[in-house]
Design a protein with these regions (language model features):
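A polyanion-binding, active-site-adjacent surface
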Residues: 1-189
Length: 189
């Protein structure tokens, strides 16, 4: 298996799908590479594409606030990645073939990290990692064991910005996440 740096360098040169033709930057991921908690979003937006880092726009600011309420910080104790590493045009959902082209990158990140908990941020990542029929509005905040990793789906911050009345439910998801972290994680959170 490649090291983090080898994987990052290979990913930066990826040409596996057409998203490489319109990207400004590959958005590989950010955070502690040995974190026990990983967040997986859908795909980079415009700000993420420009900066090369996941969740840096308005959605990222809201995600940071939600995480901070339960003492999670991207530079301290979590890792954040996306289902696809390049921005889909017009911020559309990543197509299944684009997700498949990127799947080895994310699967290798997960294998290198060995997280205990993965938070699927939004429908796309939850349908990829929890269940193809996953419905965020019905199943958010619940934990699913997949090969020894606990997965939880929650609302994408962009959805919360469009529909603020879902913020209390998202906050409850993060409380459940904090409780699960305290139950099963070894690192100090």
């Amino acid at each position: 298996m490649a090291t983090w740096e080898e994987l990052r360098q290979e990913c930066l040169n990826c040409r596996k799908c057409s998203l490489c033709q319109t990207r400004t930057n590959v958005v590989f991921g950010v955070g502690k590479e040995d974190a026990e908690v990983m967040f997986i979003g859908e795909g980079p937006g415009q700000q993420e594409d420009l900066k090369g880092e996941p969740f840096v726009g308005r959605s990222g600011q809201l995600l940071d606030k939600l995480m901070a309420t339960v003492d999670l910080f991207r530079d301290k104790n979590i890792y954040i990645a996306n289902t696809v590493k390049c921005r889909p045009p017009q911020n559309r959902d990543p197509l299944p073939e684009e997700q498949e082209a990127c799947s080895a990158w994310l699967d290798n990140q997960i294998a290198l990290m060995h997280p205990k908990i993965i938070v699927c941020v939004g429908r796309i990542s939850a349908q990829r990692y929890i269940s193809k029929d996953f419905r965020v509005t019905k199943e958010h905040g619940l934990f699913y064991d997949r090969d020894g990793i606990l997965y939880m789906g929650t609302f994408h911050p962009a959805a919360l910005l469009r529909n603020p009345n879902q913020k209390p439910a998202a906050f409850e998801d993060f409380i459940a996440l904090r409780d699960k972290i305290n139950e099963i994680c070894d690192h100090t959170y």
